[in-house]
Structure formats: structure tokens, C-alpha cells
Amino acid sequence: MSRSKMSSQRLWAVRAQFLLLWLLLWAAPVPWAEARRSRVSLPCPDACDPTRCPPLPSCSAGSALVPDRCGCCQVCAAVEGQECGGARGRPCVPGLRCGAPFSREPSGRAWLGTCGCAEGAEGAAVCGSDGRTYPSLCALRKENRAARQRGALPAVPVQKGACGDSGTTRAGRLRTKYNFIAAVVEKVAPSVVHLQLFRRSPLTNQEIPSSSGSGFIVSEDGLIVTNAHVLTNQQKIQVELQNGAQYEATVKDIDHKLDLALIKIEPDTDLPVLLLGRSSDLRAGEFVVALGSPFSLQNTVTAGIVSTTQRGGKELGLKDSDIDYIQTDAIINHGNSGGPLVNLDGDVIGINTLKVTAGISFAIPSDRIRQFLADYHERQLKGKAPLQKKYLGLRMLPLTLNLLQEMKRQDPDFPDVSSGVFVYEVIQGSAAASSGLRDHDVIVSINGQPVTTTTDVIEAVKDNAFLSIIVLRGSQTLFLTVTPEIIN
């Protein structure tokens, strides 16, 4: 065989081997071929079928379940440094972004990237315990990993925002959207005042605190509305504003039947005022906010809804009352009396008056307050001073059958009586307190006349300079003499 023929055969053999090797490589699932196929984007279905989703996976630390690229199934998001994208478009955890490769892929192909910090995220800066401001929490963690590798102390995120931030940064989207109560309080609180009442001690002749309450400013020159039962005569009334300024107040008008009072301070500057809304427009279910100073804790805020807009006084056992109270589940505690009940517009729709139990409180409607202020203004225009009024200094209820049964259930020693007026609070420092009346006494007679309703007591106070009262207390029958206080 000639040499040229042998060389030709060897050449064809080599070519055949290369061809066979190429065919084998093309058919075999080698890694680079599999990687190439994985970079082809999988199409999203026309309609999601949750039953075809795989079981929920257990995500590694730092990861979280998020919707996949198509929004059909839940997948574990990639954390920093892990691959993202690919055929199924694996997402990164919130706060990270999937970094794209430098080369542009053809249309319809998916690229594999790496999750990393989202640079330049607005408002994502954090302050570290090392005093440095990092562009994001992700950037701080990246620095911490490098610090641990070189044996340095990692920094702890101590504050959202720059280290020099004074804390007055704008609230986040959710806080801005849902914290409507805070917006109401910010608007209303400067007009709410704390009332501290003092009485003179008979032993030391010094003024000592006797009770407290709340009120709200209705005129720039210092007129303040509160509850009548908050005030007692012959006492010093000290008003403290939100800014801490203190003034002594005088009583301008008082109506014990409405349980409303108007006092006046002499401020150095104009004061912020609250406007009265229309309680007749109030609807059951509306959000309301109660502000005041319960237990002398100033600037206390509670919120709730209106349970009913017209709870008649007769339903509360107040047979002589013609007021339809606003019932709310906003908590009104002792000391909250006289504070405003406002709607979400910041308008006063009631004055906090009475708490029966947790979740059941009552307010006098603003329409009654408006009429009270209008009557006062009319008297001022006509030059008429308000009539002298007498003040006993107690809060009372007619002793109904239901109330009698409840009191006997709570106190086995409660007087065995079928009618009378139940005293549920005696105002400290008042004429009633000085005479010896106590909480939970039962008044059965005044000046020889039987007493069955609160109207009997009010009329007796109005028509007499002094009162001879028969009181039942437990198993005792007491005879007390009371001289009502005169209020101008």
C-alpha cells in the first residue's frame, strides 16, 4: 500500500473520531449545556392554578416566602450573595436587587444574577453603633461581614436614618396612611387643659389639692368649658396648659342640671381653641377620641367608636334628665371629666362626663354645649349677671329597682329601702362633704319631705338656705344639716 493512501486513511479516521466525540458531547447533558438551557425563560401560565404549586418549602435563615415571577406560587427568596433570576425568575428578599450580568441576553432568554444591596434606596439609610451612617441596612451587613473576616467588631444598627437625624424625619407610608388618631391628637391637644382644685386645710390653713379634672378652650381670651361636677366653690382652680403655663381661673357660669360649667383665665397671649361640631350629625360606629387628664396624668388619649348617639338619661336611671347622651367605648376615667370627645376632623362632639364600667362611657352632646355658651353670651350682651346658684357638691341617681338589686348584691349591708336618691359621689371640699355625706349614702328625706328623685334634691337646694337631710348608711339612720354654697 502506498504511503499516500495510508495517510489519507488515517486522516479520515481522525475526522471520524472527532465527529463521534462531537455527537456525544452534543447529546450528553454536560453542565455548560444544562446551564445554557436554564437560561431560557419559562412562560407564565394564562391562569394560575394553586393546586399545581409544589409544597411550601422551608426557607433558610434570612430568606422568606415571596410570590414567584408569575405570581402563582410561593418560593424562597434569594438572600444576599445567592443566585437570582434564571428560568423561573427567582426573586431576592425585600431590600435586595438582582444584579444583571454585563452582557446583554437575546430576547426571550433569562439571565442568572446575584442578589446584592439596592444602592441609592431613598430613606433606607441607617445609623450604626460605630457612629457611621450607612446607605442601607444591607450595606451595614456587608461591612459587618468584612469586619468579622478581619477580626474587627461589627456595628449594630441603632437608628433608622442618618446618625445626625434629630428624630423629626417624615413618617413612613404606613404610619402616614393609618395613624389618623395621631393626626387628630396633634390638632386637638394644645387646646385641652388640666384642672387642679385646691381647698384650705382646717388644720394648717394651707391650700392642698382636693380634686382634678379636664377642660378645653373655646375662646382665645381664655374661656374654658368643663363639667359642673368637676368644680366646687370656695376653692382655688388652677389651670395648666399643654405648654406648662399655669393660671388661676374664676367661675363664669355653671349649670348643674346640664352638668356644664364655664371658667375663665387671663392668658398673656391668644390661646388655641376647639370648635364645636354638630352632635346631631354623629353616627353610630364613628371613630372618636377622648382627651383629658385622668388620675392627674396630663395629655392622656383614648380612642373608640360611638356605640349610640342618643342614650336617654332615663335609660341611665336619670328620670328628670332630658339629655340624650353619647355612649362610647372610649375609656373615660376619673379626671377625664370635662375633657373633649372629638371626631376625626378634630371637632368637639361631646364633653366626657360619666363612666359606668370599662367600655361604657357617656358624653354630653356638643349641641347642648353650644346652647349653654349661647345663653351665656346672650346674658353678657344684655348686661345681665347670671343668677346666683346654689351648689351642694354631690352626684346622684334615683334609687331604681335595678340599682337597688345591684347595690344589695355588691354590699349585703346596703340599707333596706325601697326608694330614695343614691349618692354615688361626694365632691371633696364641697358643702355635702363638709356636712358628713359620703359616697353610697341614700337620701330619703329633706326638710321633712320624702325624696324619691334627683329633682326633689335640686328643688330643695334651690328653695332653701339650709337643708335637714335624713340619710341611710348601712344600718344607720343619720340626721345631717347642709348649707348649700352660693355660686355667682
From Swiss-Prot:
Query: InterPro entries annotated for this entry?
Result: Growth_fac_rcpt_cys_sf (IPR009030), IGFBP-like (IPR000867), Kazal_dom (IPR002350), Kazal_dom_sf (IPR036058), PDZ (IPR001478), PDZ_6 (IPR041489), PDZ_sf (IPR036034), Peptidase_S1_PA (IPR009003)
Extract one GO cellular component term from the record.
extracellular region
Looking up PROSITE patterns in the UniProt record yields: IGFBP_N_2, PDZ
Q: Where is the active site?
A: 229 (charge relay system), 259 (charge relay system), 337 (charge relay system)
| Purpose of the protein | Serine protease.
Listed as disulfide-bonded, the cysteine pairs are: 44-70, 48-72, 53-73, 59-76, 84-98, 92-115
Q: What is this protein called?
A: Serine protease HTR4
- Give the originating organism: Rattus norvegicus (Rat)
Similarity comment: family membership: Belongs to the peptidase S1C family.
Keyword set, alphabetical order: Disulfide bond, Hydrolase, Protease, Secreted, Serine protease, Signal
Q: Does the UniProt entry include the keyword Protease? A: yes
Chief subcellular location equals secreted
Q: Write out the GO biological process terms.
A: positive regulation of apoptotic process; programmed cell death; proteolysis
